[in-house]
Design a protein with these regions (language model features):
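Cys/His/Pro-rich metal-binding microdomains
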Residues: 58, 75, 120-123, 127-130, ...
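Auxiliary Fe-S-binding modules of radical SAM enzymes
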Residues: 2-65, 262-374
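Generic domain-boundary/flexible-linker signal
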Residues: 68-71, 85, 128, 137-140, ...
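N-terminal [4Fe-4S]-dependent radical SAM core
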Residues: 31-57, 62-119, 132-136, 344-346
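Glycine-rich active-site/cofactor-binding loop and its immediate structural neighborhood
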Residues: 110-120, 124-159
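Conserved AdoMet/S-adenosylmethionine-binding subsite of the radical SAM
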Residues: 146-306, 311
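Flexible, active-site-adjacent loop/turn segments at secondary-structure boundaries
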Residues: 45, 72, 82, 87, ...
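Short cysteine/histidine-rich metal-coordination sites, predominantly Zn2+-binding motifs
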Residues: 73-83, 87-95, 140-150, 352-365
Length: 374
């Protein structure tokens, strides 16, 4: 190839690169301009205004202080001209109809389905996040579907599901959207389920609890250092959340993903079980699940199934009645046993209930098992 042709091809290549860059920059600027138009978004609840158009979000314990143009840690709330806006209201990142057992809820409507939705964002950053593709991104970083609360409830009813589940990412940070959907869902006769990390301030928690039937907490580990190192959050606010949920009468289940060498020590498991029994009672279901390498924690091997089984045994030794296992092949860990007779009350295989021997929440011997059964 002659030098002249080489120069022509080099010039064309440079023009292509520059043109692509200009296009990407213009698209980014278009997004930014749209975001500066408050009419496009829903004003947030739970925030304070300060001098200089600074705001402080009071939805979760991060208590982000934001100058105009700044997003919160959650990537879902933004200060626009001195007001805080939800940037994810009405923007669904994913939606599915799932077995309720998948959440997992084991004491809620066995064998029924939940219309499950999520927006983008999360207010903590777990190194082992299972849904990081939507939880650790901004709303403009992925495709979303616009849907009003009325449309969401309509789709849930049309799907034949008996519940709406706010799940996959962190529903707390789409608080206004969840609240509006939950109100309509309750009025339409649907159950409402939160699958959350529990990182929320008390005032908004107490408001949302008025419209929620079941709350599942993804409890990261009974250790403050683990919370700080692995999630950027803190332990105490989550403990307070669980106490408030229990005191409200809303159904509560707890799940802990066990990670080798991080949150799987016997004393951590025993401490958690004792705390649950002392503060929440012996009938709150506790699930232990097996970790598989994901997101930024790829250098830790999958948790041995024996670790999950041992955690269940320890929690039961401490007096908890309903302790389950997940992500392992261990049938006893998927069965609800009648606490009086020891007989099988509900048998599950993976995400599905294959036998339900309860009658209005009671075993064959008449012993009541707590939960939401109809």
């Amino acid at each position: 190839m002659s030098n002249a042709l080489k120069k022509i091809f080099a010039g064309l290549f440079l023009l292509t690169i520059v043109g692509s860059s200009v296009y990407l920059i213009s698209q980014r600027e278009r997004i930014i301009r749209l975001e500066e138009d408050p009419s496009q978004f829903h004003e947030a609840l739970y925030y304070d205004k300060f001098f200089g158009n600074i705001v402080q979000c009071r939805l979760c314990p991060n208590l982000c202080i934001l100058s105009p143009g700044q997003y919160g840690i959650c990537k879902a709330r933004k200060n626009i001209n001195g007001k805080l806006y939800s940037m994810v209201y009405g923007k669904i990142a994913t939606a599915h109809v799932d077995p309720i057992e998948k959440k997992p809820f084991f004491h809620v409507l066995p064998g029924r389905a939940a219309f499950s939705i999520a927006t983008t964002g999360c207010n903590i950053q777990c190194l082992f996040c299972q849904n990081w593709e939507i939880s650790q991104v901004f709303p403009f970083d992925t495709s979303t579907i616009s849907a009003s609360p009325e449309q969401v409830v309509g789709q849930a009813l049309a799907s034949g599901a008996q519940a709406i589940a706010f799940t996959y990412s962190e529903p707390t940070i789409s608080f206004e959207y969840v609240l509006d959907i939950a109100k309509l869902a309750k009025a339409a006769g649907l159950k409402t389920l939160m699958v959350s990390n529990g990182y929320i301030e008390q005032k908004p928690l107490k408001e949302i609890l008025k419209y929620i039937d079941g709350y599942k907490i993804d409890f990261k580990g009974f250790d403050e250092e683990f919370y700080k190192k692995m999630t950027s959050g803190h332990l105490e606010p989550v403990l307070e959340t669980m106490k408030t949920i229990h005191q409200s009468g809303v159904w509560l289940e707890i799940v802990t993903l066990l990670i080798t060498g991080q949150n799987d020590k016997d004393d951590q498991i025993r401490g958690l079980a004792r705390w649950i029994k002392q503060n929440l009672g012996d009938s709150v279901p506790l699930h232990f699940s097996r970790f598989f390498p994901n997101y930024k924690l790829l250098n830790v091997p999958p948790t041995p199934p024996e670790t999950v089984i041992r955690a269940r045994e320890i929690a039961m030794q401490e007096g908890l009645k309903y302790v389950y296992t997940g992500n392992i092949d261990y049938p006893p860990g998927e069965i609800t046993f009648c606490p009086l007779s020891g007989e099988k009350a509900i048998v599950r295989q993976g995400m599905f209930t294959v036998y339900n021997g309860l009658n209005n929440g009671a075993c064959a011997d008449g012993e009541k098992i707590p939960g939401i059964w109809n």
